[in-house]
């Protein structure tokens, strides 16, 4: 008897990718929140139009609320598994302007303030963290409340 190829009867989980310029802060936080809040029923990804390095204060801000993004790396949009992405969310204006047209994918823009820019004149990391925490919490609210609705419709 010939062996049959295994065919999954389960559709893949929907995927959401967050895009910003450097893939260092906001998009990384959003990916971390999605994986933390919705990993049972969604896949999370992030990328940048001009990737740099992971922002250490973004890592710290997420760690404060029990979300570990320390193993994340900055990636280019070309590295996204587009066959697994259903919704692409740009989280900064530059990424929105540079976002390529992706046939068959829903693309929305939800901008968030840039913590490194806001914290540029901070006198210490502790002072800078005030900006990172605010943006972190705004991203959490968006990911928790809006992303499931956006995927449905």
Show the residue positions of the predicted features:
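Phosphate-binding/catalytic loops
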Residues: 8, 96-153
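Residues at the C-termini of beta-strands that transition into short coil/loop
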Residues: 48, 92, 111-113
């Amino acid at each position: 008897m010939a062996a049959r190829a295994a065919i999954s009867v389960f559709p893949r989980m929907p995927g959401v990718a967050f895009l910003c310029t450097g893939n260092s802060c906001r998009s990384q936080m959003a990916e971390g929140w999605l994986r933390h809040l919705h990993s049972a029923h969604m896949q999370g990804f992030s990328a940048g139009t001009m990737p740099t390095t992971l922002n250490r204060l973004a890592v710290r801000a997420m760690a404060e609320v029990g979300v570990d993004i320390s193993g994340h790396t900055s990636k280019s949009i070309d590295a996204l598994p587009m066959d697994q992405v259903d919704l692409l969310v740009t989280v900064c204006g530059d990424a929105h302007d540079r976002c390529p047209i992706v046939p068959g994918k829903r693309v929305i823009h939800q901008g968030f303030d840039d913590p490194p820019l806001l914290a540029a004149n901070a006198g210490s990391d502790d002072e800078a963290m005030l900006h990172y925490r605010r943006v972190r919490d705004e991203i959490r609210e968006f990911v928790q409340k809006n992303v499931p609705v956006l995927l449905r419709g």
